[in-house]
């Protein structure tokens, strides 16, 4: 999830001296389930509110703090480290920042995932890429679109096929929701 993305960013040589704000929207997660309820507009609204928080200077040091701190610096870039949030809200976030006249880069994880998917291919090789993701990410079609576009631009693979499988409960399992994890399971779920 987002913490593994942050860990990779922090280890990048050119970014070692930067300060980071990690924001996990625990109140509205998992984002991957919003499309199951046909509620992607609410998902986009949550992501925009997340961005507004990151743009502001106020924050609370703890859950029981009575007054906000006001010393948070303006962010230089925003990484949306959730596939479903990237799929449904990235373009809206970019437009929001542009309309606000803010020169802040926004990066989504899907393009990075599409780039990484080609790591095991030799130039000109045919191949298939399997995407296992939340229902929302799969329904968005964002990964096949990004993979095909990347291949079209780079011409790395001769013929590429993309297969997707939505994982029921995958978002919850990633976040270690006790309802979604059965450590003693010996077969797939009956509703899968």
Where are these regions (language model features)?
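Non-catalytic structural scaffold of enzyme domains
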Residues: 1-192
């Amino acid at each position: 999830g987002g913490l593994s993305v942050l860990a990779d960013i922090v280890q990048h040589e050119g970014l070692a001296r930067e300060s980071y704000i990690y924001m996990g929207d625990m109140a509205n997660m998992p984002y991957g389930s919003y499309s199951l309820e046909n509620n992607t507009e609410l998902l986009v609204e949550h992501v925009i509110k997340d961005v507004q928080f990151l743009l502001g200077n106020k924050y609370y040091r703890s859950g029981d703090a009575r007054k906000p701190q006001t010393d948070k610096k303006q962010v230089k870039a925003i990484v949306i480290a959730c596939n479903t949030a990237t799929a449904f809200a990235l373009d809206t976030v970019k437009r929001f920042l542009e309309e606000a006249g803010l020169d802040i880069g926004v990066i989504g994880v899907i393009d990075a995932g599409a780039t990484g998917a080609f790591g095991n291919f030799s130039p000109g090789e045919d191949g298939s890429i399997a995407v296992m993701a939340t229902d929302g990410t799969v329904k968005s079609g964002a990964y096949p679109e990004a993979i095909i576009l990347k291949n079209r631009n780079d011409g790395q693979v001769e013929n590429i096929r993309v297969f997707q499988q939505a994982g029921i409960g995958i978002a919850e399992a990633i976040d270690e929701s006790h309802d979604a994890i059965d450590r003693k399971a010996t077969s797939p779920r009956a509703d899968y």
